[in-house]
Amino acid sequence: MKKRLFAASMAFGLAIVLASCGGDNQTTSGDVKTTTDLDKTTTETKTNSGSYTIEVYDLDGELVGNETLSIEEYPSLWEGLNAKFDVEATGSDGSHWLTSINQTVVDKSWSLMIYENDTLASTGVDGIVVDNGDKFTFKNECWNTVESGWGSMDSYEVLLDQAVYHYAKTKMKTSIASSTSCFDSTFWQSISLYNMMKNKYDSNLFNVNSYSDAYKESITNANLDDLRNATAWATDANIAKWYYAARLFDTDLTKFKEVYGTYLDSLTTYGSEYEMPFTLSIAKELELDNKIKDDVKNPTSRASLQYGTDALAWQITGMALYTTLDDSEFSPFTLDAINAAVNDFGADLSTSVANVLFPLVAMNKNPRDFALDESNTDLIKYLFDNCYDKENQEFLTEKLGAGDYSSNQIYASLMAYKVQRDTGTGVILFA
């Protein structure tokens, strides 16, 4: 999403001064820049002895930095900040536009705001003169809100940003590296991580190289010797999940191709029509389709949308893997058919709402445009009102309806939706 160019009053300019220099301030997100003419000079006289304190809070509201500094040693706020914190900044002619402090994110529509003694500062980091006993607090705050009168985001989208940030900061960090299976929730984490990587959110949230390497190792170490029994509920769809995640992260597929070829040699029938598109699609991509017996490719055994919403997420995956199959081998899914199935689902709250969100994002649709029930409650609002524990910042899977669905699935789709919203470009979740 491009940040709007506001023809606003100086009051608003002061409010979004963020952590920038004193003159010609600019926002750091988007292609369009907001500028204000703030005088870098000050006539205020302050002491050159004593100390001042700097506090830094991330988007979670968590204190991630707290230092007390000597004015004699660090006479300017910038000098103290740069010496004691992990600071990233841009700027020219000696000015400093802060983009990150201690890896705290400056996300799209969010800003690092400076509070001087608990009052919003009227200038940027280069225009502030320190005094003995001063406290400078840097906080992440969302400016692009309907409530502020300056933006378009409502309280639910602000909550979504906070939820996605918290998930990326905590859950992904601890579970990706420790996982030994890519047939379940880790797959959804791979989708989340991939979206963050491709859209450069990773640089502010975590070291993308360390976590992508850990995830790649997790994929590589998965047990491929008995694919259909790798998990208690392994199917061709779960095999497709491993293959898809491996393909996203450029994992060596030599071992997989060998094992998968042996599996296709032994395949005499599909467990169900539901599994068919995954097997055919992977076989085509790996040039192993000659191993699939003709009677297995019975054209009467075609996957359909008649399995209900439980299958929608897997069907989308199958469609994404689908490359060269033609109608004689496989009747491909159409977006119209998926859209119709989603609309038919509508008020059926007994099935996991997660499965509605996936196809909508995959279709490059805005989930908020689709009603969940007769009162036109939108999907994201429903999720946060009914399925989200705000205190602990996590989705309650037991409230997501029927089906054993991990909250990782929800976050994968929310991340894709967020990327789509912030960049103004379509994000295909399964592509």
Predicted regions and their residues:
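Positively charged n-region of N-terminal signal peptides that target proteins for export
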Residues: 1-5
